[in-house]
A protein has these predicted regions:
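Internal/C-terminal transmembrane anchor helices
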Residues: 1-11
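GHKL/Bergerat-fold ATPase module in large chromosome/replication-associated machines
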Residues: 15-17
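Extracytosolic and intramembrane catalytic regions of membrane-associated proteins
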Residues: 25-28, 35-147
């Protein structure tokens, strides 16, 4: 536990410096260890139009992350102040992206957790299909459709 706290402080500073060095002007960011890990860390930073993600291992030869993944927010695809969407926004601590399927369906991806595949920006661990039914947005887990 003590190592995790120490690593958290170190990794936060490392990500802040790497975003600054890469000229990524963020309004907020979050860094956390990957699942069941204290060595490999993940961060997501919010900019005006995108989220920028990076991974960093405390055993890396590099002193900071250098590979960044940019994902557009697309927050204009739905009314983000709709009560159903506000609940999802709260759940994901405002770190989310949207992508359109069709007029009544949107994919909501929670970005708090690392991508399942670093090379695939759509491989979010928590993804939901939002289905517009009347005045409500109903959710269906995309993991149900994957398996």
């Amino acid at each position: 536990m003590i190592f995790t706290i120490g690593n958290k402080i170190y990794v936060n500073q490392t990500f802040k410096k790497s975003f600054q060095k890469a000229n990524i002007n963020y309004s907020k960011f979050s860094a956390q260890p990957t699942i069941l890990n204290n060595v490999l860390w993940y961060a997501v930073a919010e900019t005006d139009k995108n989220y920028t993600m990076a991974f960093y291992s405390i055993f890396d030869n590099n002193t900071r992350p250098t590979n960044f993944i940019n994902i557009p927010k697309n927050h204009t695809l739905v009314d983000v102040n709709h009560p159903d969407i506000r609940t999802l926004r709260w759940f994901s601590n405002e770190f989310y992206t949207l992508s359109s399927l069709n007029n009544n369906q949107v994919i909501y991806k929670d970005l708090r957790y690392p991508l399942l595949d670093q090379k695939d920006s759509t491989s979010s661990l928590f993804s939901f299909k939002l289905i517009k039914e009347g005045k409500r947005w109903n959710t269906k887990s995309l993991s149900e459709e994957r398996f």
